[in-house]
Design a protein with these regions (language model features):
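Active site of divalent-metal-dependent phosphoester/diester hydrolases
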Residues: 301
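Extracellular glycoside hydrolase catalytic/binding regions
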Residues: 19, 118-121, 125-128, 132-133, ...
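Active-site mouth of glycoside hydrolases
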Residues: 2-171, 176-185, 193-195
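His/Asp/Glu-enriched short active-site or ligand-binding loop at hydrolase and phosphoryl-transfer sites
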Residues: 292-297
Length: 301
């Protein structure tokens, strides 16, 4: 529990990285724009059917889809090299998908757990030594709400160990339970492994960041917008409340000498005070030395 993570010089000396979550498919214009914006890090999501239950159950079809996504990323990495952009490979849609409760099937079914590890072995063999790849992000926003034979922590550990046997050099990214929530860092233990980066997502408070997402504004009779800073439920949300909500991550960082990566954070465009919320988040990330990628860049195109 008191494990101190160490990093090779290449990672330890790397300055704070700032960037964005990727579109579903890159164009040349996307890369040129990211370069103009001085983006240094992109979290490249391998995803489909977000929000749907019981997807990605046909593993042969899943592998064909995955091969196409990896082919695309390999071409993107080649084109992006001249811009000096680094990428985190993010397995956003793992084999087996999620059930109706949003738990991941692979935590409960050996077939999908085994395939998850095989997927990462394939990715590691393909991208080992690729200068554009900053890290392997094993699974996006794990959710495990009940006891599981292949729990969110141990399955990531097993995949990390499998990757390390193939690629000992590329950093591995681990995520916490509860949608990679900062709150779940209270019970997250570090892997007994070096060169591991720990990721958090920041969408707190959700009633602000996601207000009226999914057309609930019209469905709920045009209730009032939630403003930041301001009272939300029983709490007053401002920069210090954001800091308080992230405290478990900060404690984890200091206790374990961990490099922290904020893989996603955002607020919906129409949220009153969204720019203030983002500014306050980024100022805290920068104060703590956390890498960050904003969600998202041209995701809806």
């Amino acid at each position: 529990r008191d494990y101190k993570v160490s990093y090779p010089e290449r990672v330890a000396s790397m300055p704070l990285l700032r960037g964005v979550m990727s579109p579903h498919k890159f164009t040349d214009d996307d890369l040129e724009t990211l370069h103009k914006w001085n983006v240094k890090l992109v979290r490249a999501q391998i995803t489909r059917d977000w929000g749907k239950a019981n997807t990605d159950r046909d593993l042969a079809e899943y592998d064909r889809w995955l091969d196409g996504k990896l082919d695309h990323l390999e071409e993107v990495f080649k084109k992006a090299r001249k811009y000096g952009i680094l990428f985190v490979i993010d397995l956003h849609s793992p084999p087996g998908g999620r059930d109706e409760t949003r738990d991941m099937h692979m935590f409960y079914d050996k077939k999908y757990a085994d395939h998850f590890i095989k997927v990462w072995q394939r990715i590691a063999r393909r991208f080992k030594g690729n200068p554009s790849v900053w890290a392997y992000d094993l699974v996006n926003e794990p959710v495990q709400t009940r006891p599981a034979p292949y729990d969110y922590w141990n399955l990531q550990r097993m995949a990390a160990e499998a990757v390390r046997r193939i690629d000992p050099d590329t950093p591995i990214v681990i995520e916490s339970n509860e949608w990679d929530s900062p709150v779940a860092f209270r019970y997250l233990s570090p892997l007994a492994m070096d060169n591991v980066i720990y990721q958090v997502h920041m969408y707190h408070p959700g009633q602000f960041t996601h207000q009226f997402v999914g057309n609930s504004y019209g469905e709920q009779g045009k209730r009032d917008f939630v403003r930041y800073p301001g009272k939300m439920g029983s709490e007053y949300w401002d920069k210090e409340m954001i800091r308080k909500r992230l405290q478990a991550v900060r404690d984890f960082q200091k206790r374990h000498n961990a490099r922290i990566f904020v893989g996603e954070f955002s607020a919906i465009l129409w949220a009153p005070g969204a720019a203030d919320y983002l500014r306050d988040c980024i100022e805290i990330f920068e104060e703590y030395g956390w890498d960050w990628t904003y969600h998202a860049f041209r995701e809806s195109k």
